């Protein structure tokens, strides 16, 4: 195996992670003409459903950016209401315990619904806009280290080390800023010693599935929240 190492041109910003957050930032800065280095450790955009919901105010923002039409071209689901279901006491089955509007009246939003669309399709909308502005996400690459020294290089103080996921290539980039958009397992955040404040990680379990469902469940087009209580915390009558 031959290792190829190189030093890249200085960048205004290095972005690690090409999920919706990293891509949104990259899209905004690319439109303003900034030099961006954007890497992601996956060979392709997200292949399955993950964070598939676009909130009403986010859709407003996408409209202002001229990207809403590209999102809506995929004919996403529009959710106007959320329903909650709980186990039906001592009997079998579940019962609806409440509903509320997906976008309550007190929220100042142009679109009163949550938009549901495969995350990979959302990412591709941003990626298409990036290409128009001369930015390509470098895949599959990851960050391996970084340091900052303003005394050594006050204009581009951040030194970022990147490598191909198979270890055959490495790069060193100098930048003004480094942005970690890698999600829960962020290398950047961990190296900076920034923890995540959250509740008991086993208190709630989420499941996400992609599929075509044949069902008579009454709230299938609403956005149901079915709550299952663990044995240790079942409510007592």
Predicted regions and their residues:
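Core beta-strand elements of the Rossmann-like FAD/NAD(P) dinucleotide-binding domain
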Residues: 9-11, 166-177, 181
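Beta1/beta-strand and adjacent pyrophosphate-binding region of the FAD-binding site
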Residues: 3-21, 37
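A conserved short coil-to-beta-strand element within the FAD-binding core of flavoproteins
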Residues: 139-158
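Conserved FAD-binding catalytic core of PHBH/FMO-like flavoproteins
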Residues: 128, 177, 181-237
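Glycine-rich FAD pyrophosphate-binding loop
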Residues: 28-50
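Conserved structural-core and active-site-/substrate-pathway-adjacent residues in large, well-folded domains
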Residues: 26, 62, 123-126, 130, ...
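Active-site-adjacent segment of FAD-dependent monooxygenases/related oxidoreductases
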Residues: 47-133, 147-153
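General small-molecule cofactor/ligand-binding pocket signal
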Residues: 136-138, 197
């Amino acid at each position: 195996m031959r290792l190829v190492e190189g030093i890249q041109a200085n960048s205004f910003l290095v972005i690690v992670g090409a999920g919706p957050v990293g891509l949104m930032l990259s899209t905004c800065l690319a439109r303003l003409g900034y030099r961006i280095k954007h890497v992601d450790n996956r060979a392709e955009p997200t292949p399955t459903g993950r964070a598939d919901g676009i909130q009403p105010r986010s859709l407003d923002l996408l409209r202002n950016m001229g990207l809403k039409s590209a999102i809506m071209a995929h004919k996403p689901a529009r959710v106007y209401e959320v329903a909650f279901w709980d186990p039906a006491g001592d009997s079998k089955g579940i019962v609806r315990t409440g509903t509320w509007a997906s976008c309550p009246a007190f929220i100042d939003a142009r679109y009163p619904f949550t938009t549901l669309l495969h995350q990979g399709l959302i990412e591709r909308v941003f990626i298409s806009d990036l290409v128009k502005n001369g930015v390509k996400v470098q895949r599959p690459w990851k960050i391996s280290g970084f340091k900052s020294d303003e005394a050594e290089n006050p204009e581009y103080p951040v030194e970022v080390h990147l490598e191909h996921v198979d270890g055959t290539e490495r790069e060193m980039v100098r930048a003004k800023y480094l942005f970690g958009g890698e999600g829960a397992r962020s290398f950047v955040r961990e190296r900076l010693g920034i923890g995540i404040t959250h509740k008991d990680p086993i208190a709630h379990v989420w499941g996400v599935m992609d599929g075509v469902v044949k069902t008579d469940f009454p709230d299938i087009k609403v956005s149901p929240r079915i709550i299952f209580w663990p044995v240790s915390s079942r409510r007592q009558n």
